[in-house]
Amino acid sequence: MKRLVAIVCLVMVTMSSALAQQAKDVTNNKSNMKSFKSTAWLLPQPVLIIGTYDKEGKPNAMNAAWGGQWDMHEIIISLGSHQTTDNLAVNPELTVAFATAETMVASDYVGIVSGRNTPDKMEKTGWTIEKAPNVNAPVFKEFPMTLECRVKQKIDESETGYYLVAEIVNILCDEKYLAEDGKPDVEKMKLITFDPVHHTYIQLGKTVGKAFSDGKQLK
C-alpha cells in the first residue's frame, strides 16, 4: 500500500512539474510579444497613384495607401477630402497606377501637396501625361501598369471623404514589363509598398512560391 501511495505521489509530482514548465513556457512566449494600441498597421500597404481631371480638363494626381480589391472587377479606396474628390464629383472617371522605386520621389510628392493650392503640382513631377484611351482621366506614362476605372459607388460619403468603389474598365501595361506568358511581370516593375509603422517605402522582392500550389504538399 505504501508503495502504491509513493508511486501516486511521484506521478503527481511529475505532472505538477510538467504543468509548471508548460505554464512557464507559455509565459515566456507571451513575454516575447509586445502589444501595441490599435492603429492603421495593415501590412503591406499599396502605393496607389490616382489620376483625375477637373472640370476644365486639368490633370491631378494623389497618393493613396488605403485601397484594395473589392470584387473581381472592382476596387475600393478610402479617400479623404482632396482635389481628387472634387474632380470625381464632376467627372466620375479615374486611373489608378502602382508606384515604383523609380517613381517614388514624385509619387510621395503628390501625396504631400494638394492640387487645391499648388497650381504647378503636376509640372513638378516631370511625368508624361496622356489621356486614357477608355476613360476621361490622365495616364502617367512613367508607371508600368495603370487601371482605367469608373466610379460605381461612394460609401459613407461625408464632408471629410468616403470609400470609393470603382469599376475596372481596362488595364494598361507597358510591354517592357510583360513576362514570357504575355502577362504583367510584377518583379520587373519594382513596385513599392508603404510601411505605415516607420513611414517608409519598401521595394517588393523576389518570387518565393506559387500560390494555390505550394501548400498542397501539406495535404
PLM regions and their residue ranges:
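Positively charged n-region of N-terminal signal peptides that target proteins for export
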Residues: 1-4
